[in-house]
């Protein structure tokens, strides 16, 4: 299981950096974006060159040895993706030392409660007045990412890595962060560096396997997970990760077996129990899938996990053709998300309801509500808000283009373009490309549409439109390759299923 990038339990799309920026951040590469964007491992032009420390590790500033012990225990739990347990350790550390900047920073980084994250960010900023320069850079990296200010975040990350080039944990964090931005090759380079420094770094073994899986190199990923299981033989997460990657590779029976092995190690391991539901759903056994989701729900510790499980439960009805029941279930989950004031989930559920709407008018109404939810007061980060708004606008452009409402589609594309210029977030940039590709296709500009759609490779709807245009252009080889890729998509979101089922018939 991955904490930042979950192949199955992820209805909020990944946050990416613009392609040019991603290319520019590879270590020791020449800057490709602009003079304002340093290459990863180089310093920001606006900052003094950071001193290179001979110490391998970033210091941990705290007045309490007990707080430091708890913080480090939390780190190790987090490397094995036991996020709830890690957060509990970090919260306890802040009680021992209320001015523990790194503990507050990690709560910001991995917290699931938006209100807690907002409070932790404020505490971290106050506590950072008395910490080392490296710790201040770590905080800046995290806070700027959380606010959706990616260029500033990269600059801070660059400077921090330049200060501590032999810190395996920072290389690991950089790799995981790049993975969350969709730069899997760059992520793999940093994760491999962490493993060169510490060959038994369990979290890095797991993360590298996911890097490879995201590049569809499943056979190369599996040995790292087997090594991970050797390093952590009593932990369920290595088996859970192996099950998830086998699922993504379409090896569903093997995936079921590995989820069961994980549950033997920890019968209360929520992610593996939910994973069983996902695989049975992919196998077409929706009754059994719902039974497994029902078992998983009481195991969920965080409200977001409960909502994830309930959403998957609802989607199972759509998979068996009972769209009315799926809508009813999603409406029920929406009530719960609203009660918990989880605006990102409210927005996503409206997106799902738009996909299942009885009419285009109803679909657009749900997209209106998805946008309106994001404007409501909440503790949602700027990054999360931009991600959800970008997805809503892309869906609006796609549906409007299909309906021939080119004015509405153009307005959505224009809005996305303004967001790209303001945020430099790649989730926005890719959504803009996908939306513009749909609009250009509707305007009978297939060549331009093809180039745009290629820039949105993780969106199933964009890839389906790409395959259609490639076929119409008599580009049989490319069309076949795109269709094969879609057919091999074993993602578990509603959109994955709605699109991919057409390519498996």
Question: What does each of the following model-derived ranges do?
Answer:
Residues 63-92, 96, 136-159, 163-169, ...:
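Alpha-helical segment of the N-proximal tetratricopeptide repeat
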């Amino acid at each position: 299981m991955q904490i930042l990038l979950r192949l199955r339990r992820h209805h909020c799309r990944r946050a990416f950096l613009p392609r040019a920026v991603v290319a520019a951040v590879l270590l020791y590469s020449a800057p490709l974006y602009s003079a304002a964007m340093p290459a990863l491992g180089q310093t920001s032009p606006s900052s003094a060159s950071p001193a290179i420390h001979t110490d391998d590790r970033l210091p941990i500033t705290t007045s309490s040895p007990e707080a430091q012990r708890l913080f480090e225990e939390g780190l190790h739990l987090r490397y094995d993706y036991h996020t709830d347990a890690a957060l509990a350790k970090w919260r306890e550390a802040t009680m021992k030392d209320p001015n523990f900047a790194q503990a507050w920073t990690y709560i910001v980084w991995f917290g699931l409660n938006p209100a807690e994250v907002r409070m932790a960010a404020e505490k971290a900023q106050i506590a950072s007045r008395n910490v080392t320069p490296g710790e201040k850079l770590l905080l800046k990296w995290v806070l700027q990412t959380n606010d959706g200010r990616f260029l500033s975040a990269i600059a801070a990350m660059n400077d921090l890595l330049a200060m501590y080039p032999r810190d395996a944990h920072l290389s690991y964090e950089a790799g995981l962060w790049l993975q969350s931005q969709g730069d899997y090759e760059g992520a793999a380079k940093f994760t491999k560096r962490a493993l060169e420094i510490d060959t038994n770094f369990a979290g890095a073994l797991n993360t590298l396997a996911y890097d490879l899986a995201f590049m569809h190199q499943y056979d190369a990923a599996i040995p790292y997970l087997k090594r991970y299981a050797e390093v952590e033989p009593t932990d369920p997460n290595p088996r859970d990760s192996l099950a998830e990657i086998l699922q993504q590779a379409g090896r569903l029976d093997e995936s079921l077996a590995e989820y069961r092995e994980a549950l033997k190690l920890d019968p209360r391991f929520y992610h593996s129990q939910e994973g069983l539901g996902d695989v049975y759903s992919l196998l077409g056994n929706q009754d059994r899938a719902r039974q497994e989701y029902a078992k998983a729900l009481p195991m969920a510790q965080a409200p977001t996990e409960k909502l994830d499980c309930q959403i998957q439960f609802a989607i199972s009805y759509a998979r068996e053709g009972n769209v009315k029941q799926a809508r009813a279930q999603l409406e029920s989950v929406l009530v719960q998300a609203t009660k918990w004031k989880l605006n990102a989930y409210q927005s996503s559920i409206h997106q799902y309801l738009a996909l299942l709407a009885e009419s285009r008018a109803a679909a657009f109404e749900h997209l209106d509500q998805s946008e309106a939810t994001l404007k409501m007061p909440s503790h949602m980060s700027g990054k999360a808000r931009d991600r959800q708004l970008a997805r809503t606008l892309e869906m609006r452009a796609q549906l409007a283009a299909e309906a021939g409402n080119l004015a509405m589609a153009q307005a959505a594309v224009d809005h996305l373009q303004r967001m790209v210029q303001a945020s430099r977030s790649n989730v926005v940039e890719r959504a803009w490309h996908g939306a513009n590709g749909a609009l250009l296709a509707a305007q009978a500009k297939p060549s331009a549409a093809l180039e745009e759609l290629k820039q949105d490779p993780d969106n199933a709807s964009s890839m389906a439109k790409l395959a259609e245009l490639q076929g119409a252009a008599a580009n049989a080889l490319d069309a076949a390759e795109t269709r094969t890729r879609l057919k091999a998509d074993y993602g578990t979101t509603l959109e994955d299923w709605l699109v991919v089922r057409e390519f498996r018939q």
